[in-house]
Amino acid sequence: MAEELITPVYCTGVSAQVQKQRDKELGLGRHENAIKYLGQDYENLRARCLQNGVLFQDDAFPPVSHSLGFKELGPNSSKTYGIKWKRPTELLSNPQFIVDGATRTDICQGALGDCWLLAAIASLTLNETILHRVVPYGQSFQEGYAGIFHFQLWQFGEWVDVVVDDLLPTKDGKLVFVHSAQGNEFWSALLEKAYAKVNGSYEALSGGCTSEAFEDFTGGVTEWYDLQKAPSDLYQIILKALERGSLLGCSINISDIRDLEAITFKNLVRGHAYSVTDAKQVTYQGQRVNLIRMRNPWGEVEWKGPWSDNSYEWNKVDPYEREQLRVKMEDGEFWMSFRDFIREFTKLEICNLTPDALKSRTLRNWNTTFYEGTWRRGSTAGGCRNYPATFWVNPQFKIRLEEVDDADDYDSRESGCSFLLALMQKHRRRERRFGRDMETIGFAVYQVPRELAGQPVHLKRDFFLANASRAQSEHFINLREVSNRIRLPPGEYIVVPSTFEPNKEGDFLLRFFSEKKAGTQELDDQIQANLPDEKVLSEEEIDDNFKTLFSKLAGDDMEISVKELQTILNRIISKHKDLRTNGFSLESCRSMVNLMDRDGNGKLGLVEFNILWNRIRNYLTIFRKFDLDKSGSMSAYEMRMAIEAAGFKLNKKLHELIITRYSEPDLAVDFDNFVCCLVRLETMFRFFKILDTDLDGVVTFDLFKWLQLTMFA
């Protein structure tokens, strides 16, 4: 049995972000040009296996215990005892990938709590075009079989092509997880494996919302409806959604974990994900009745109330009409009245598809835009509006609404612009094995005042203290995504996505969906420094008292070394009892000398020390001004305001880097680190200004100049 050794080359940090942006500009990540997940190329790997006469084994998701899980399905769990990884060709003499097209009965739940995923897969079978975006044509256990398959999934704004081998978890010769009702089709089991791979393990799929899988199969965006507060036109909404090819799922909420997957007296499963597969009207006793068709991934547990498979209501429906609805017994699919649907279920999810997924000129297409962002402790993770001191540091996005809705779209007489906002946190399932789960997330929308219109600047704390939000996410909740349909008058608005509490880190995707065109942009400050012209005094112009002080400090050589500078600064700072500091380190002082040393001798002369001295005095004034709680140190967020007061405007990425480099583990910034940061910033800006001879904001270095500058900066 072959093992295909995959050795992808990874970029890290800033270089990874640059490479990702270049890939996006080249069109990578679109469905027609999907990114090869983990660098694995399906066609090349398959061709290599066929050429060598071996079957593929995926070292990126190997048939070992950690691929199953980390706790309930971990290496020492009794639930994984006896599991063996086998290929379908070892289980059956004639396994099939798909027989007569993919159908809803191909999906039956196994021992994994991923009914939410299987409900989405069942809905996927209703639309052949969408199905084969996820499950590419041309895969088989017969012609060209090499033990390798591939699937395409949408992952946080981009499509990825995921390769898997066909080694599946089995126990006693049967599949442990998803399987087909007939037992001889394996496309759904292999799709489940691909989904487990991108999420880190099978166990990572346990528990979730159908909307997650809906979106990962389509790139669409999901809306939620509380069926206890259902709008009066919900049945029409469902009909239109099905007509548009949307994917629908529903469930019954539970209030106690002991109720999870408990069966009601009418045979519905609590906390279990169902897919909505159709909606029709039938004539019953002379009246039209609204019906909903449901699918239970378990297969055999079906609704036993009115309009169930063997209920008497069907006897009073015209046989032709009954045949059109294809009522079958015990196949996991059943009909129920819309009235009972509202009464029995508590939540409905509708995944609206994007224009590229719909591929139809007859349907109204969405205008879509998305942005990727991060929340980082101390710089961009400000928490929700309950934390006014830090809320303003969150990433901000502007949306410009110009075209109002068509008059017949809404009942309201007031004109307005409708759009859908969706905030998604990234990679949280994959991080479950490290003890991290979903953060509580949401967003707020603010109207931009007329005097600030058109300005692409990050709004500061005072704005949010003085202005209330115009809209917000309905809840802050620990789901992968929160979304809301919002309607506002034309104008400019600021969207602020956040975690509920400050300093909760994560990556996110913010998506805008609108039926009318709307302008969007990410807000960030432009990098600039408002520095006064540097006035360099000659030795004769320097105050005599300062010369006397310098003579005492410098010694016989009349220059201050790195060690002498450390002694001087720490002696001075120790007299300021209101400052929290560990003192200037030798490395910090070496950095200051390197940055201020103009003649390159590694020491500071009278003029050089005079410049540094005056700067430190100015920095002390700023530090005390922005140490708002008089703790002797600044918080990371106070640091951001202090940097701006010192004349520097930086974008959020630079603020992230500064906090990473200059703050303590508790995100406090001591005076010594504050000084080092500002000295470095000012010197680097001045270096750049000198080197930017064309004044075009671009400087070109050869390798020597680059190393010379960066090694001693």
Curated annotation (Swiss-Prot):
Location of the region described as Linker in the Swiss-Prot/TrEMBL record: 526-541
Sample GO molecular function, one term: enzyme binding
Residues bearing PTM Phosphothreonine: T354
Residues in EF-hand domain copies: 557-575, 584-609, 614-649, 679-713
Chief location: cytoplasm
EC number(s) per entry: 3.4.22.52
Region feature Domain IV, mapped onto this chain: 542-712
Assigned keywords, A-Z: Autocatalytic cleavage, Calcium, Cell membrane, Cytoplasm, Hydrolase, Membrane, Metal-binding, Phosphoprotein, Protease, Repeat, Thiol protease
Modified how: Undergoes calcium-induced successive autoproteolytic cleavages that generate a membrane-bound 78 kDa active form and an intracellular 75 kDa active form. Calpastatin reduces with high efficiency the transition from 78 kDa to 75 kDa calpain forms.
Domain Calpain catalytic: 55-354
PANTHER family the UniProt entry points to: CALPAIN, CALPAIN-1 CATALYTIC SUBUNIT
Protein name: Calpain-1 catalytic subunit
Origin species: Rattus norvegicus (Rat)
Gene symbol of the encoding locus: Capn1
